[in-house]
């Protein structure tokens, strides 16, 4: 499986992506760097696809990845049914421009309505 390193080792990268994905699904919109937004988008799409299946096994699989049980409940009760007819493309990455402090390219990641 290919992925971006995000200048972190495996454990740090995994923790960062878990936390960002959980925050994104909780708030339905986050602002982060472009590289992180693209990686979180991939993971969020997989979580929403699991939520569309709505089985006990898929719920447990989402619980093993996401860090908050309330987010899993929201994912399976609100977000999953909303995208039931849609075949992928649940998220959108909007480029925002460079960050003030270090010039890192920023992006807004949001759910498609």
Swiss-Prot record:
Keyword flag Flavoprotein: no
Organism, as annotated: Natranaerobius thermophilus (strain ATCC BAA-1301 / DSM 18059 / JW/NM-WN-LF)
GO molecular function, one term: structural constituent of ribosome
Subunit structure: Part of the 50S ribosomal subunit. Contacts protein L32.
Family statement: Belongs to the bacterial ribosomal protein bL17 family.
UniProt xrefs under Gene3D superfamilies: Ribosomal protein L17 (3.90.1030.10)
Family matches, as Pfam families: Ribosomal_L17
Record carries keyword Ribosomal protein: yes
GO biological process, one term: translation
GO CC annotations, alphabetized: cytosolic large ribosomal subunit
Protein name: Large ribosomal subunit protein bL17
Keywords, in A-Z order: Ribonucleoprotein, Ribosomal protein
């Amino acid at each position: 499986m290919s992925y971006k390193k995000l200048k972190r080792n495996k454990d740090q990268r995994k923790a960062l992506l878990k936390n960002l994905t959980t925050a994104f699904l909780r708030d339905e919109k986050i602002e982060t760097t472009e590289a992180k937004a693209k990686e979180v988008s991939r993971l969020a799409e997989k979580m929403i696809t699991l939520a569309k299946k709505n089985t006990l096994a898929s719920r447990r699989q989402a619980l093993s990845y996401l860090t908050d049980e309330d987010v899993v409940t929201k994912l399976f009760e609100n977000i999953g049914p909303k995208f039931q007819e849609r075949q992928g493309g649940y998220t959108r990455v909007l480029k925002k421009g460079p960050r003030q402090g270090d010039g890192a390219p920023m992006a807004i990641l949001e759910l498609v309505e």
